[in-house]
Amino acid sequence: MEIVYVYTKKRSEFGRQCNFSDRPAELHVDILPDESLLSNFIEKNPVDRGIQCVQEMSEHEINTERFETDSRGINHMEGGWPKDINPQEVEQVLRFRKKVEKDESYVTTIQNLASSMEHTIKQNNAIDIYEDYFADLEIEEVEETPSAKTINVFRDPNEIKRPATHLSWYPDGPKKLAVAYSSLEFQKTSAETSMDSYIWDIENPNKPEFVLKPVSPLVCLEYNPKDVHVLIGGCYNGQVAFWDTRKGSQAVEMSPVEHSHHDPVYKTIWLQSKTGTECFSASTDGQVLWWDMRKLGEPTEKLIMDPSKKGKMENAQGVISLEYEPTIPTKFMVGTEQGTIISCNRKAKTPPEKIVAIYKEHIGPVYSLQRNPFFPKNFLTVGDWTARIWSEDIRDSSIMWTKYHMSYLTDGCWSPVRPAVFFTTKMDGSLDVWDYLFKQKDPTLSLQVSDDALHSLRVQDQGRLIATGSNSGTTTLLELSSGLCTMQRNEKALVTAMFERETKREKILESRQRELRLKRQGASAQGQDDDEEGGPDEEEDLVAAAEKEFFQIVQADKKKFAAQQAKLSEQDNKIIEEAEENNGSEKKDTENGEKEG
């Protein structure tokens, strides 16, 4: 539509803007009634009227001041240390402190706070705030029978059940439990068997909270202690993968097949590092591989478990268990299929130097290996039909061990809160709780957890909850009684004395065996020298002397036997003569009696 004509008007002709204000009511028009019109109307009586007996309401709208809200979080680290500083690492702490103390703002702040801090310190020193008013009051110790109760049971949701091969607790409290499911029987899995593993909420056993979907069944699974959303898993085909629960069920990254293990990965452990992305894995192919999650293309380091220290794969022993203590970051230990425990040093320069010590006493695979959290020099191993406690100083034998059980032992671990308590699982589906301060020959508590064999075991860091996984895919969550998860009076000192006593005893036995071994070696060497000097004539003389000595011993035994027979015959003759005399005297007595009668 085209504009035909435009009307133009000046701004000054628009008039003023409206300006409203409050004022009282005014009467402008008042029309009075006209009585002449009254005849036009008729009064109606009665009149129908409708009324509503309710309170009158009206709708009003108001505009209030709007407040904008948003969600914010705060990340508190223990001790106020930065994320990349581990408070347990002495070198990192000292390095960080020196760096901060050189800062000018730090020095200025300390000088400004010195006066107020000094005043506060004087206030604290004026009164002993740590005074114990009831130091002499004896606490009544209530003897509680060791017990445990089942809290929840988590079952494999698939139709074809698989063993629960590994368990891992959520690092930030007893909230979740990650379970790896895999069948380790060779070529026994079908195409319909699921490869999924699950993360369970311990309050909801009906449905898994999260599903992990690997390309191969997971044999082991571990939470990252520094990032609760990240997990590392070892697959049945030898690959290593890690998941981030914020990014879905699929693995974020996997190691390539050509640079991975060639057998199932039985154990993966996170390393104590600044980045929190380093880990290492062990497999029955005889290799231990180190990885960095930021680059899984190939391992950062490799070690072949060859006890001969030659680094040959044909001599390597398959690794089933792996141990790493964060307080000793350079050391780790492995347990092999052949029953050998190998102690290693990662920081050694050459592969032979990395294998430090070898312990051998199990006659079957070492399924579990863990250091005591209170005494790192002592470690627990579980294999064949026994559980054994070792000392690093004694290599020939363990210092303590359990009796041989009727069922095969499958897993074991220490209590994180009591140095004298450890747990073991068996093929008959039972869980044994051992308290070495209470008794050492038998378990303190034995529970029949499942009708199927128990395969895995894990204790929560607070020591109250314990989870076990069975061959049927059932994970049972148990709660221990307070006596089993509360440190007893003087327990640490008593356990220290017990370990030292047993270590000293084994050292004495070891030195005695060494002396006997040297004597036997010396005697055998001397015998060989005599044989070489004497020749065949002396050998014939020795044989003749041995035969002569043998026949002399036989003749002496014959004479001794003949003397014993003669002595026995004499005794028999005496007994017969005495019996005949007694019979004769009895006959005479009877004849005399008849005559008198």
Curated annotation (Swiss-Prot):
Taxonomic placement: Eukaryota, Metazoa, Echinodermata, Eleutherozoa, Echinozoa
Biased composition annotated in UniProt, kind: Basic and acidic residues: 584-597
Family: Belongs to the dynein intermediate chain family.
Name under which the protein is recorded: Dynein intermediate chain 3, ciliary
WD repeat windows: 159-210, 213-253, 260-301, 314-354, 361-400, 404-444, 449-488
Keywords, alphabetical: Cell projection, Cilium, Cytoplasm, Cytoskeleton, Dynein, Microtubule, Motor protein, Repeat, WD repeat
Region entry Disordered, spans: 512-546, 562-597
Organism encoding this protein: Heliocidaris crassispina (Sea urchin)
Record-linked InterPro entries: Dynein_IC (IPR050687), WD40/YVTN_repeat-like_dom_sf (IPR015943), WD40_repeat_dom_sf (IPR036322), WD40_rpt (IPR001680)
Quaternary structure and interacting proteins, as annotated: Consists of at least two heavy chains (alpha and beta), three intermediate chains and several light chains.
GO molecular function: dynein heavy chain binding; dynein light chain binding
Biased composition (Acidic residues): 528-542
Compartmental location: Cytoplasm, Cytoskeleton, Cilium axoneme
Top-level lineage group: Eukaryota
GO BP annotation list: cilium movement; outer dynein arm assembly
GO cellular component, one term: microtubule
Function: May play a role in the regulation of dynein heavy chain activity.
